[in-house]
Curated annotation (Swiss-Prot):
It catalyses: RNA(n) + a ribonucleoside 5'-triphosphate = RNA(n+1) + diphosphate. Residues 1-73 form a transit peptide. This is DNA-directed RNA polymerase, mitochondrial. Pfam families: RNA_pol, RPOL_N.
Amino acid sequence: MLPRTASATRTPHLNRLVSAGSRRVLPRCSSSLGIRGSLAATPRLLSTITTQQPSPLKRQPAPRATVGFERHLATVLDEPAQTATTPLYELRSFSPQAPLTVRDHTKVYAKQRVNYHGIPGDVNEMFLVFEACLQVGRLERAAQVLKRLANLDVVPPADYLDLFNQYLDAKVSQLLQEPDVDKADDIHKAFETMVSDGRELPVGGETVALLLKASLTSTDPETMQRYVTRYLSLLPTQIALETVFNTEILTYEELTKVAELCPKYNMPDNVDPDTFAQQQQQQQQQQQQQQEQQQQQDTSIDQSEVSIEPLLTSSEPSAIPEVLGTPQKGFGLQFVKRTVSMFKDIPDGFDISTLPMSQQREIQSKLEKDCVDASLARWREENESLQKMGLNTSLDTPSLNSRLYQWQKDLETRLRTMLVEVEKSEMVSKKNKDDLDRCIYGPFIRQSNPERLAAVTIISTLSSLAMGGAHKGSTIASLITHIAKFAEEDIRVQKAEALISKRNLRKAKSKQHNPRSVLRFKNSTASAGSSDMADSNNVAVEMDDEAWTTTIRTKVGAALLSALLDTAKITLVREDPVTKTLITQNQPAFSHVMQLRKGKKIGTIIPNKAVVELLVREPVPDFLARHLPMVTPPDPWVSFEKGAYLETKTPVLRLKNGEREQRLYTEAAIARGDMDQVFKGLDVLGKTGWKINSPVFKVMLDVWNSGKQVANIPPLDPIFDLPPEPASTEDPTVKRAWLKEIKVIENERSGLHSQRCFMNFQLEIARAYRDQTFYFPHNVDFRGRAYPIPPYLNHMGADHVRGLMLFAKGKPLGESGLRWLKVHLANVYGFDKASLQERQDFADENIENIRDSVNNPLNGNQWWLQAEDPWQCLATCFELAAALELEDPTKYVSHLPIHQDGTCNGLQHYAALGGDTWGAQQVNLVPGDRPADVYSAVAKLVIKGIEDDLAKDNEFAKAMHGKITRKVVKQTVMTNVYGVTYVGARKQVLKQIEAAYPNITAESGIEAALLASYVTQHIFRAMSTMFKGAHDIQNWLGEIGGRVCRALTPEQLDEFERSERSPHGDGTASGENITLAGNPRKSSAHKNDEILNNFQSTIIWTTPLRMPVVQPYRKHGTKTVSTCMQDLVMTIPERSDPVNRRKQLQAFPPNFIHSLDASHMILSALHCDELGLTFAAVHDSFWTHASDIDSMNAVLRDAFIRIHSEDVIGRLAAEFQARYKNSLYLAKIETGTKVAQEIQRWRVRNKLGPRKELLLEKERQELLRSSNPEDVERGKKMISPASLYELYSSAEDLTVPEDLKEVTIGNLAGVEETKVRRGREMDEEGEVDGSEEAVEHEDGMHEDEMLADEPRDMDGNSGLDELSELRNTNHFALSQKRAKASIASGGKQKHYLDIWLPLVFPPIPEKGDFDVRSLKDSTYFFS
């Protein structure tokens, strides 16, 4: 029975709450149908319902910004408000005792099978299919989804009603477009069916208004009267007046008709109908005048755009030569050229920034939207040009580009056939497997048109193959994901454009029919405020479409790829070896094969050899157009996906697939204003204008077109001396060695070619932008580090790209600027460890070399090529020479960015945190006459250690004596602070030793790898000595991080208790079919680990800028997805996935430091902007004009001091204590202790098991926290393992500390057993290294090296003993020896006991005596 809403006897306040509560505010997405022009996205994202309606005068955040947002304790909202005069660059106060906490209330529903109608069983996928069906007008399919949701009874009533309203909205819109009695009857039947299913649904004004609109289409007056009366009776008069009549659904004429049919809803007696009609007519005239004015403005804009056409058409050819294409002529390079083709029509010297802003934005929008359209137009034009020349494009031609048009047309035809098949599959009563697949992916491919889908499929397929190596092919799983992502992105762009047009039309219509400004109703006692409240209740809050699920992406991508494989053909022309005639043969362009990889059969797409040859010559850029530099300042960041590019939605946070938790925290922080400083900082970085350095570009272009190798530009045709192939009669090992050498050469050749291809793109973009002012929009990673979004050309690029960059805005040098310009020259040359005066003198002493480099860069003495950064050196030479040409060089207007680099910035932060005076001196935190060099200091300590070993006649010391230089230790010292492990450090040292001493193995008789291990031990020991305070902090960070990763929060404990008391009683959800990666643990000894696998917590903290950081490392589950090509096992990332404890622990200290240096950079950017400085940054390298360097350096020091003047570590400890308050963690204690023996006796007596022990401890802690003294007393009397631990270990902490070998500075580790131990722990963790994307750090290290596992510790001489043993024993004998030793020591192995304890953290390490305020006078902090 349908419940009636509360009676009209309620107070106005209660009525407003009823009105607000009758309909939840849900996310919105665009719709091609619908009265309101927007559809609610899905209720799966809704986690909280606001009990107080927001003010209609304030712009409300998108619902996802408040998903799961809860305030615990006192939040920032309770703190004193920041005054309006507080500068942005000042740190905002926040209470670490009240951290932002997000609870994701998204329910995990039991997954069902796809039903016989082809409706998926996953609730999230049902929502997506429902939205897609409404979008493409397949309302009968949408009705089937609604029916299944109702049958499963998994959606709350209010959310289900909102879904029904969306369906009703679309049905009514369809009825109005095509009036039909049957369609109207379907609407009424659908409502009655919903009412009669027994669910109590809170029907509100929106539902009634839609039903009334459908009723008014009836041609029978009696039927119309009956329906209108019936639907209005569902709501009391007062509620109907405030909701139904205040929606935007019913027009004035329809409201008048309803009032005629039901007189009690008529206008008040004191309103004259003639006066009312006259007012409406006047209002419509005003709206019409406004529309005409708007049209005139639009016309004037169009005319102004036409008027600039002559400016954009040059009659003379450009003076800048074309960029010589690396034998890739055609597809890849031509695509770049086509993408930036609009610049080719602009005469030299014309800057788009001189146009009005509206025209600049129009050009930028065109640039962003030009990707697929440019490809289609280019393919079509080339095909037509070949046809005009009488060439057959199906025959063997030298360019893949000539075939793409035919591929596109054939694929377009196949997709049209596919859509017909989808429609048939939806209609057939008995569906087979293919029909069910089509029913799922059909609504999604219908959202685009076949022409665009075909182009997107071809572009994404070729780009994926080209990026991964065409000759190797690509796995089906990665390829279909790549295709589906780009198809999804393209569909979103099309929907966004349609939504903008629909909004404009809707606004025009609503302004013509808006009687609510003068309309008042009889019996309405609500105040104006309540009327506004009712209006605000009906505002559709729009948000971004929810991303497709992995299953939907897989099915869509597989369907598109399968269609491409069926249609893409390549025609080969070959000569018959016998008859010498030409034979034409059609072959598939791609093949689907199964390959063995690591013992598993993997579906792979292999291109035809002819296609591979073309792809090698013609690499394909990856949707380049949407990620070019902007020609207008980026839009300011205002929400998670609103900012930067004008047309392309880009998230402010760089996320991997499925990282939902970081997004939830970020959106919650945005909602309460915590991201304001980060947003403003990104805006500052983005608004910095750039231009191309023309003199350097011309030199670079000459080098490029010559095909020679100069600086870091590889040669066009590299020459390698190939070793002669050994005779077939020789030893097979010789042949294997020859093949290995050939492979190395081919890999190097391929690497140089790839490098040149990428540079080709960069130079083509630089040529297109050579006269333009352009901008790099920025976003951040999960730690808060800022990165430019355009990936191909930006100031974070290699030396040749940085050499091309100039600030668009120039500033006179002045005395200070001239001095810093000279210092910068010395820095980029490599003379950067001298004093500032010595660096200035270096430039003065090389004036002739500088002038020669400028006047004759390629044929002179080429002094600039000897620099550490030659292209940046050349750019500085041009700038300095131009200044010196003036009578007064200080008056020269300089555009060159001057860099100020930190001295191992991570160690600077660690030294400040730990208070290490010695360490602070080595990283220039302490004032000095000359710059300190931490790398040289570490090298000296290593040399001293080797000399000590030499005195003991150590053979390794003899081999390395006199061979330790600054360069050998530099990379290891630099990366140590960022989590480099022993394995990664050893690789770094080995690379340096082999480069400097290639014959060291032959000379010393010791393998270079063993010598690298020896040196690495000394480096790590030196680091731990120099940075003792930092070492202690890393230990502390690792310990608290490890405890958090083994903890259960109160919410998780409650969930665990509910699952234990459920009928299943196994702690898992019924019907769950996702399995965790790794080996399941079935032994009873691992019950606690099973609990943790389901409920582990990730490490979360807040940066000084109040940005929440959520570490993303989890062990994702897998799911088998059936597609039209093959069954695929796909990774399914979920927020509920257990964390990868090993990576969480290892990554915490370096990520924490990264979050500090990111905060330092943003604060510096904000302060520089306040002072009017131009600012750019490359992590810990900050750039500005030469004349502003002194000001920027003062800002950098001030920001660092402000960050570290606060108790950063103390605040982190307080935040963790608050964030993980009342949690329990799984601790380990040694079995030989007294407390362990008592616990074992208790367990023997009680026999509870791990699960019940956990529940027992949960109950005990709740009683102890109770405000009831009796409960507290009961808790004190309870006996549990934790209470026994508290009783017997009150004097000291007996828990086993975390294994921190992977975490701390100066970590020493052994050499062998790495792979064995690593493999064993990987099995235990259930993690496969290859499953994570490799994240390259600025030092060139990859994440797998930074987070590699560690072998066992080695202290003192034990490391040398083992190295000697390794040298003198073969691998097999060593393995046998260690296996026996392991068995022999089995009885002595330590055993541990697991117990659940309240989560507490160890005390903060004592800080050293370094005072960070002394930094204020340090000249070389950044220099």
